[in-house]
Amino acid sequence: MAARIKKGDQVLVLSGKSRGVRGEVLAVMPKAEKAVVRGVAVAKRHTKPNRMGGEGGIIEREMPIHLSNLKLVDPKSGKPTRVGFRILEDGRKVRVAKATGEVIEG
């Protein structure tokens, strides 16, 4: 399946505690159908110190969100949009914003 949301994209959270928040995608996990978004779904993790120099304590980190709860923000208009695909004349398959028809780079 082609990736509609990729690392570095700006997305809008559609549901959950962080509903309405925009953020940048830090990582995508295609097999789990989840993504990690900066500043969204932040959880506190209690960690023990380890020998490799890692300090213990309470660490805040972003947790994965299901891709169905995210919507890509169109880079041109700044509004959330659905994503489609189009094959260009040179044979490349590119992502396209459904709302504006603009090609999404990346």
Swiss-Prot record:
GO BP terms, alphabetized: translation
Species: Gluconobacter oxydans (strain 621H)
Origin superkingdom: Bacteria
Coiled coil: none
Signal peptide stretch: none
Family as reported in the entry's similarity comment: Belongs to the universal ribosomal protein uL24 family.
Protein name per Swiss-Prot or TrEMBL: Large ribosomal subunit protein uL24
Entries under SMART domains matching the protein: KOW
GO CC, one annotated term: ribosome
InterPro entries noted in UniProt: KOW, Rib_uL2_dom2, Ribosomal_uL24, Ribosomal_uL24_CS, Ribosomal_uL24_KOW, Translation_prot_SH3-like_sf
Lineage of origin: Bacteria, Pseudomonadati, Pseudomonadota, Alphaproteobacteria, Acetobacterales
CDD domains xrefs: KOW_RPL26 (cd06089)
Task performed by this protein: One of two assembly initiator proteins, it binds directly to the 5'-end of the 23S rRNA, where it nucleates assembly of the 50S subunit. One of the proteins that surrounds the polypeptide exit tunnel on the outside of the subunit.
